[in-house]
From Swiss-Prot:
Official protein name in the record: TATA-box-binding protein
InterPro entries (UniProt xref): TBP, TBP_archaea, TBP_CS, TBP_dom_sf
Organism: Methanococcus maripaludis (strain C7 / ATCC BAA-1331)
Residue spans of the Sequence repeats: 7-83, 98-173
One GO biological process term: DNA-templated transcription initiation
NAD as UniProt keyword: no
Pfam family of the protein (one): TBP
MF-aspect GO terms: DNA binding; DNA-binding transcription factor activity
Family affiliation: Belongs to the TBP family.
Length: 181
């Protein structure tokens, strides 16, 4: 049975083809904040889709908080349209690259994190962080496993990698259980 894996955050980046006057952009974009003494980029928050866009003077744009790459592209295109309507010369449909995805799922059991921490590529310091950190090399992701059975997978570039990583973890946990009990 396939696990139910939910994408909870997608971070993408793009280059919109020209330098941006951030002071001007902050004036014309709704929900934009530009405080260069605190952060070098303009922060623009949209409600539909619910994302935050970081726009930099160089024309680099990052979108975070999306639930899918498609939502991120929709948000980027909304901002591009607003900037174009204000007279800025910006390319249509720039290439959008996924930088990171975060997914969540459940193990369906309450794991013994102390036992799992004996495996290579794991870190578990419950005084500092309640989850066990498990670093996989293929796919290159970080899996956080909590005592409740909740699992967070970060560092994803593709949704398929979440399933591969989760199935590797399940296989490893079954092998560990057979060894220990």
């Amino acid at each position: 049975m396939e696990p139910e894996i939910k994408i909870v955050n997608v971070v993408v980046s793009t280059q919109i083809g020209t330098d941006i006057d951030l002071e001007y952009a902050a004036d014309i974009l709704d929900n934009a904040e530009y405080e260069p003494e605190q952060f070098p980029g303009l922060v623009c928050r949209l409600s539909d889709p619910k994302v935050a866009l970081l726009i930099f003077r160089s024309g680099k744009l990052n979108c975070t908080g999306a639930k899918s790459k498609d939502d991120a592209v929709i948000a980027i295109n909304k901002i591009i349209k607003e900037l174009q309507e204000a007279g800025m010369d910006i390319i249509d449909n720039p290439e959008v690259n996924v930088q990171n995805m975060v997914a969540t799922t459940e193990l369906g059991m309450e794991p013994n994190l102390d036992d799992i921490s004996t495996l290579e590529c794991t870190e578990y310091e419950p005084e500092q962080f309640p989850g066990l950190v498990y670093r996989l090399s293929d796919p290159k992701v970080v899996v956080l496993i909590f005592g409740s059975g909740k699992v967070v997978i970060t560092g994803l570039k593709r949704i398929d990698d979440a399933y591969v990583a989760f199935n590797k973890i399940l296989t490893t946990l079954k092998e560990l259980e057979e060894e220990l009990y």
